Amino acid sequence: MDTALKRSRSEEPVELPPPAREAEEKEEEEERMEQGLEEEEEVDPRIQGELEKLNQSTDDINRRETELEDARQKFRSVLVEATVKLDELAKKIGKAVEDSKPYWEARRVARQAQLEAQKATQDFQRATEVLRAAKETISLAEQRLLEDDKRQFDSAWQEMLNHATQRVMEAEQTKTRSELVHKETAARYNAAMGRMRQLEKKLKRAINKSKPYFELKAKYYVQLEQLKKTVDDLQAKLALAKGEYKAALKSLERISDEIHERRRSNAMGPRGCGVGAEGSITSVENLPASKPEPDAISVASEAFEDDNCGNLVSEDDSETQSVSSFSSGPTSPSEMPDQFPAVARPGSLDLPSPVSLSEFGMMFPILGPRSECSGASSPECEVERGDRAEGAENKMSDKANNNRVLSSTSAGGGRSRSQSSTSLEGQALETRMKQLSLQCSKGREGIIADIKTVQIG
């Protein structure tokens, strides 16, 4: 029983702690994402071509380096062999090698002069043949022109003769130059041969004794020259293979940069709005339709102006109605003459601090219409309205003073400029309200005087 329990416990999967499990799940998710990206993205066909070039260049470089190393090793081995054998032979021959060196040097110079003279002779012969062929062409052209009975000398014939003449002149110049070079080389060759014969007669015994040494030296010299030429060719081929390898690497690097840039742009996605611009996006088309919301001060000032003007209009209407009841004049207010001065509309109110609409209502109580008073045309009603206006003016001045005190207290002792500006604004507001109340009282006095005049009349 115990063994069965142990076996069942051992077969149960071991639960990992939460951090280890999360890390393992994260790694598995990253691996799946990488595999998915690799499967989704197709391999750029340019990569395959550049990789083939890179592999081919690598093989060429390895092969050329091996061949170059073998050629250099062979050159060094031949050089060592020639040095050892020539030293042994020089020791065997003795002093005759040093004595016969001038002769062999003169012989080498004569051989070089002979080769130059042969080359100059070939150039001279070639120039002579070209000159002869050009002269024959001109003679044949002239002969055909003379044999023709019509003798039509057209532009094509003239152009052919011009080319033939030009070739003759060039051939003559080439022949002259080659002739001069041939003479110079022939002179050097004759001088070298004369010196060689002179030394041969003088050093005949030493020359015969050291001849095996210099013949072996010439043999190794020719062999070393051939090996040196092979090494130079292999070095040029190796440099070419390295250039191809470098070009393939640059191409692969450029393709890799393009792929990484494309992946980065795809991962970033389209560019969105800046920080803080998510909730306040307003299109250009909706700009004309959007209107700024009025603040509390502007709403209060507009309400105050509308109520004052409404009160003035209602008072004018009531007075007009009372006048029309006592007189037989015009029955509509529009037919009455303009006897009352126009009341100036107050401008926008500039308060020293933000004031809500309810506070503004407390500061400036709005008078009700004149019709609400019991005695519309009685002097008691006029006195009551005057008391209301005076009370409203007193409350307004008290409220403005309180606002000035509050604003000056909140500003602190270090803001003298803000306090002075606040007090000036409060004084300007008080002066403006006094002017408005005076204008309203003047309008009422004029209306009362007109009513009394009508009643007396």
Swiss-Prot record:
GO CC list: cytoplasm; cytoplasmic vesicle membrane; mitochondrion
Coiled-coil intervals, chain numbering: 46-92, 99-147, 156-202, 213-257
Membrane topology of the entry: Peripheral membrane protein
Recorded consequence of changing S353A: Large decrease in phosphorylation by SAPK3
Annotated GO biological process: intracellular signal transduction; JNK cascade
InterPro entries assigned: SH3BP5
Residues covered by region (Sufficient for interaction with RAB11A and for guanine nucleotide exchange activity): 33-267
Organism superkingdom: Eukaryota
Biased composition (Basic and acidic residues): 1-12, 44-53, 382-398
Sites bearing Phosphoserine, chain numbering: S353, S377, S378, S420, S423
Listed Low complexity bias regions: 322-334, 406-427
Amino acid composition bias (Acidic residues), ranges on this chain: 25-43, 308-319
Signal peptide interval: none
Free-text function comment from the UniProt entry: Functions as a guanine nucleotide exchange factor (GEF) with specificity for RAB11A and RAB25. Inhibits the auto- and transphosphorylation activity of BTK. Plays a negative regulatory role in BTK-related cytoplasmic signaling in B-cells. May be involved in BCR-induced apoptotic cell death.
Protein name (record): SH3 domain-binding protein 5
Organism of this sequence: Rattus norvegicus
Originating gene: Sh3bp5
